[in-house]
């Protein structure tokens, strides 16, 4: 069983890498490769450190929902992490001439459907959390670019490593024009992601656990079990629709997801 000292040491290792932008060794030497409870405890500790600096929770992200990304990461199940206000860089391409790479360690980018919740998802029992329930809780769907990142050197991760590292979260960009679910069916969307005009990733809604709304249901169950249910106003990044890809300073990334506005993000040093 993982000790509190080992959990604390893992939190400190990842927090230092996050603050210095210098990648660290994996934390599986401290928490093992099978102790998910310990991995999520490390994640909680890492998030609490950010909250202590004034950041606040705005939602959740679901990771490793597509087979392509699971293969890229070498994992076989999804996970989740927290979204903080400081991760939102939706306006930086327009306001600052690009998103600074100095905030990142080893970033990759992926396109996905995000959901803005209009209702809490906290029914009397876990069995009540159905796709129909979470669909009803969604206010709007929006296109998203997630800039995933790993504080662990060379992305040398097992499942517990990525969970501990807040599900390899980094930054995100979301569209300004939301679409109600009466106008778009998430599982049917098609996605193309280009870098400097060249397609680098493609996929569809069915690649995300069969349906992004199924991914949302899965997340709602996990949050319910952890005693921290999804709430009205939360943003949920539901998971990649295709493989994630690396990018560099000076790159222009565009994501086209059918039924949504095209998203553009530019990156600088």
PLM regions with names:
Residues 214:
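Glycine-rich, small/acidic residue-mixed loop/short-helix segments
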Residues 227-234:
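Beta-rich strand-turn-strand
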Residues 32, 221-223, 238-240:
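Short alpha-helix capping/helix-loop boundary micro-motifs
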Residues 237-238, 255:
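A generic structural signal for residues embedded in beta-strands
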Residues 2-211, 252, 260-269:
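Catalytic-core "active-site belt" of small-molecule-metabolizing enzymes
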């Amino acid at each position: 069983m993982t000790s509190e000292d080992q959990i604390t040491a893992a939190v400190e290792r990842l927090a230092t890498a996050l603050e210095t932008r210098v990648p660290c060794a994996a934390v599986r030497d401290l928490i093992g490769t099978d102790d998910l409870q310990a991995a999520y405890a490390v994640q909680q500790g890492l998030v609490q450190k950010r909250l202590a600096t004034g950041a606040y929770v705005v939602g959740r992200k679901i990771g490793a929902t597509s087979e392509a990304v699971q293969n890229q990461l070498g994992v076989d199940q999804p996970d989740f992490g927290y979204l903080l206000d400081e991760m939102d860089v939706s306006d930086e391409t327009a306001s600052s001439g690009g998103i600074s790479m100095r905030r990142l360690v080893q970033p990759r980018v992926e396109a996905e459907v995000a959901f803005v919740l209009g209702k809490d998802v906290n029914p009397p029992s876990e069995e009540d959390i159905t796709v129909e329930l979470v669909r009803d809780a969604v206010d709007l769907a929006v296109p998203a670019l997630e800039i995933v990142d790993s504080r662990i050197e060379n992305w040398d991760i097992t499942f517990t490593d990525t969970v501990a590292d807040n599900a390899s979260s980094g930054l995100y960009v979301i569209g300004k024009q939301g679409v109600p679910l009466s106008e778009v069916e998430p599982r049917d969307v098609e996605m193309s992601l280009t870098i400097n005009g060249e397609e680098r990733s493609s996929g569809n809604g069915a690649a995300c656990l069969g349906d992004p709304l199924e991914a949302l249901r899965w997340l709602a169950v996990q949050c319910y079990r952890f005693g921290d249910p999804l709430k009205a106003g939360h943003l949920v990044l539901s998971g990649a629709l295709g493989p994630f890809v690396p990018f560099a300073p000076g790159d222009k990334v565009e994501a086209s997801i059918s039924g949504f506005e095209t998203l553009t993000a530019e990156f600088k040093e």
